[in-house]
Amino acid sequence: MKKRIDISTYLYIVIIVIIYFMGTTMGLAQEVITASNFDSKIAKDIVVVEFWAEWNKANEFAELNKLKDSSVYRVDIMHCSKLQADYKISAVPTVVVFDNGVEKERFNANIMFQLEADKKTIQTSIDTIILNKFK
């Protein structure tokens, strides 16, 4: 005799799968930008860009998506050597905060290719830019 599984069981399974995948991928959902769209992406408002490389994925800035009041993007220096040269990126990860296309602050990796700044430090930089707009 076949067991009958009602629609609510299927719905329950689908919801669990969706919640699982949202929880495991949302933290990694920064847009990777290239040389062709870089200038247009950083031109407006406050933008935080992480310059990174696939070979140093273990040290990427994992909290990039948790920053508030800014757009966040990533640049893979292995595919954007011109941007690496233009912005003088010598170690990855390097996080650069832009305001209307102008570099305001930079946070570099140390000799172990680990970012020395934490989320709070970078968020403070963003908050300072916002506060200065009201002075």
Regions found by a protein language model. Give the residues of each.
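Local sequence-structure signature of Cys/Sec-based thiol-disulfide redox active-site neighborhoods
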Residues: 32-68
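Bacterial N-terminal signal peptides that target proteins for export
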Residues: 2-14
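Extracytoplasmic/secreted cell-surface and envelope-processing proteins
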Residues: 58-60, 83-84, 105-107
